[in-house]
Amino acid sequence: MNLTFENHKNGNGGFISLKNEIEEIGRLTYTIQPEKNTLIISYVMVFPKFEGQGMGKKLVEKGIEFSRENQWIIIPHCSYARSVMLRMKDIEDVFAQ
């Protein structure tokens, strides 16, 4: 399965979508607080037929990459994103616990 990510940034918010060759698999929605150098992950959603395949984790990893590129700290308001990040190593540079 060929997966692609698209970042749909609009002002201080947006979402990252994950797609295969045919359709959207899920998305991570975020808000940027530029004055605080933070990226807030609002929620991570994966369509039911793709659940249990690690797609949500891939979205969180892409959010981490986006945050690192911009030198932002992530505040995960989404409980799923927070639980994934708590299990990850080497993200202290971007994770506000």
Predicted regions and their residues:
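C-terminal structural segments of small proteins and small subunits
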Residues: 62-97
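STAS-typified acidic loop motif
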Residues: 15-21
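A conserved beta-strand-loop-helix scaffold within acyl/acetyltransferase catalytic domains
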Residues: 9-10, 21-22, 28-38
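Conserved acetyl-CoA-binding loop-helix of GNAT-fold acetyltransferases
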Residues: 52-65
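Active-site rim helix/loop that mediates acceptor-substrate recognition in acyltransferases
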Residues: 1-13
